[in-house]
């Protein structure tokens, strides 16, 4: 297991061999699509992209470039999966390629055009999703791909919004991730709406508002929390509340700020209170920090000297500690 990029969520790392074979098993996702459709939702499924899937895997053997060896076998399976999703009545599919925000390397970037040319043959409209960091340097690449739109993380990298407003063709969809999918705090709705005005002017109805990333990183529903301090609770938004925030942002963009005045006022009050509340802002601590002498945040000796002194005193083995966090939790907390 390893962490999903820089989050605290983990995934089982697949191991790739030169003779690895892939096959499509769409039954589970099709069942989930049908369930959502039965409740009246227009479904936009999300898949991990083929380039990210191969990049994140563990190469078990030295068989050369994963792109050249495995991608020709993987792409037909993605095409089958997309066809099955299209047959279920889905118009849009989001395919996430977060490696664009990582240092994937030139061969992986060069593989995007051919990969998405192949995926574009499926009868669905593809939104290519990115998150956790800026992909502004790849705006031209993304604009050139045969896709219907791009999702960007405007929470972790708000500065990239201007780049995509300038460089993304207005015929494409810009999905702006403006509500933080990774924390528990309410968004500053008024500020978000203001930040989106230029994008709204260019893209019109092709501007989508979205969480910055999957909401699986947030708790489900704040309404289920009955023991939180009411004041602190008023600053929070879990996944269910973040969806409401997105609805308010959409309405404000379409119909003006007056159409969501009550929501804006509640957001303003929560943001202002959290910014100054004494429960989380300790004036005494702030004063102590401000009065720290110069160099108080620096070590007295470099690491090379400290490690020698530590070893001379403690005689530690190579791996002195190794523990999982769950080992320190009680069973009720762990379960």
Each predicted region: which residue ranges?
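Domain-level signal for soluble alpha/beta catalytic cores
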Residues: 1-335
């Amino acid at each position: 297991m390893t962490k999903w990029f820089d989050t605290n969520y983990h995934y089982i790392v697949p191991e790739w061999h030169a003779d690895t074979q892939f096959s499509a098993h769409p039954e589970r996702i099709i069942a989930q699509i049908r369930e959502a459709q039965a409740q009246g939702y227009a479904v936009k499924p999300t898949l991990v992209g083929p380039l990210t899937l191969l990049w994140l895997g563990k190469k078990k053997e030295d068989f050369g470039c994963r792109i050249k060896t495995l991608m020709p076998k993987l792409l037909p399976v993605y095409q089958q999966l997309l066809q099955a999703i299209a047959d279920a009545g889905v118009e849009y599919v989001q395919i996430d390629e977060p490696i664009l925000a990582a240092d994937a390397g030139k061969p992986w970037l060069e593989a995007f055009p051919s990969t998405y040319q192949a995926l574009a043959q499926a009868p669905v409209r593809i939104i290519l999703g990115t998150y956790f960091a800026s992909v502004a340097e790849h705006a031209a690449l993304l604009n050139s791909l045969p896709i219907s739109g791009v999702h960007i993380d405007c929470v972790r990298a708000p500065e990239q919004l201007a780049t995509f407003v300038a460089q993304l063709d207005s015929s494409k969809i810009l999905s702006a991730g403006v509500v933080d999918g990774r924390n528990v705090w309410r968004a500053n709705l008024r500020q978000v709406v203001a930040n989106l005005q230029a994008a709204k002017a260019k893209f019109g109805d092709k501007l989508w508002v979205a969480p910055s990333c999957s909401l699986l990183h947030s708790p489900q529903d704040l309404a289920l929390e009955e023991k939180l301090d009411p004041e602190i609770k008023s600053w929070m938004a879990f996944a269910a509340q973040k969806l409401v925030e997105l609805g308010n942002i959409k309405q404000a963009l379409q119909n003006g700020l007056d159409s969501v005045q009550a929501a804006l006022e509640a957001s303003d009050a929560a943001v202002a209170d959290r910014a100054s509340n004494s429960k989380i802002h300790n004036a005494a601590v702030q004063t102590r920090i401000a009065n720290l002498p110069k160099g108080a945040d620096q070590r007295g000796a470099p690491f090379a000297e400290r490690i020698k002194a530590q070893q001379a005193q403690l005689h530690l083995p190579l791996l002195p500690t190794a523990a999982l966090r769950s080992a320190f939790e009680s069973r009720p907390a762990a379960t």
